[in-house]
Regions:
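Catalytic, metal-anchored helix/loop core of enzyme active sites in primary metabolism
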Residues: 2
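Conserved beta-strand hairpin/beta-sheet module of binuclear metal-dependent hydrolase folds
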Residues: 7-65, 144-155
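Core dinuclear metal-dependent hydrolase active-site scaffold
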Residues: 18, 122-148, 152
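Residues at the C-termini of beta-strands that transition into short coil/loop
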Residues: 20-22, 100, 136
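Active-site HxH/HxHxD metal-binding segment of metal-dependent hydrolases
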Residues: 30, 49-131, 151
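Ser/Thr-glycine-rich phosphate-binding loops at phosphate-binding pockets of nucleotides
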Residues: 47, 73-76, 135, 139, ...
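Short, small-residue-rich loop/turn micro-motifs
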Residues: 100, 156-157
Length: 157
């Protein structure tokens, strides 16, 4: 397995890359995992916390891969997974898709998806398909995404 270097895209499967966030800690391990998925265009899963350098790393990764970022999905709205979505969307003109924000005061209240995703739905990610799987438990709005052609599950936490 390749070394995890924050900000650098690491291939994990055909049409899937991981970019490690720069927020190591007790709750995040080496940092939040952000993913870029797609064949003709990219979907970012979990853009991470507000961190301009991480946003730039995701944009540079897309440039290196040679595909535009068209969508941003989050697995849940904890502050280490979704707050970076707004800056990334503004920089890439990507659409925001994912869960609603629970009204418990513990979530990223800046998250506002253009489209709410539901269990069983399928999302086209530039020629690669993700199936939405509702997995409440860690937090009530938690979603996982199954990359159907690779049988690869993006779980968030």
């Amino acid at each position: 397995m390749a070394a995890l270097i924050p900000g650098h895209p690491t291939p994990i499967a055909p049409n899937a890359w991981r970019v490690l966030g720069r927020n190591p800690g007790m709750m995040t391990g080496p940092g939040t995992n952000s993913y870029l998925v797609g064949d003709r265009a990219l979907t970012v899963i979990d853009p991470g916390p507000v961190d301009h350098e991480h946003t730039q790393a995701l944009l540079h990764a897309a440039e290196k891969i040679g595909r535009p970022i068209e969508q941003i999905l989050v697995t849940h709205t904890h502050r280490d997974h979704s707050p970076g979505a707004r800056e990334l969307a503004e920089a890439s003109a990507a659409r925001l898709l994912g869960p609603d924000v629970p009204d418990d005061g513990l979530q990223d209240e800046t998250w506002a998806p253009e489209r709410r995703l539901r269990h069983g739905e399928r999302v086209d990610c530039g020629g690669t398909e993700l199936e939405v799987i509702a997995t409440p438990g860690h937090v009530g709005n938690h979603l996982c995404y199954l990359m159907v052609d690779q049988n690869l599950l993006f779980t968030g936490d």
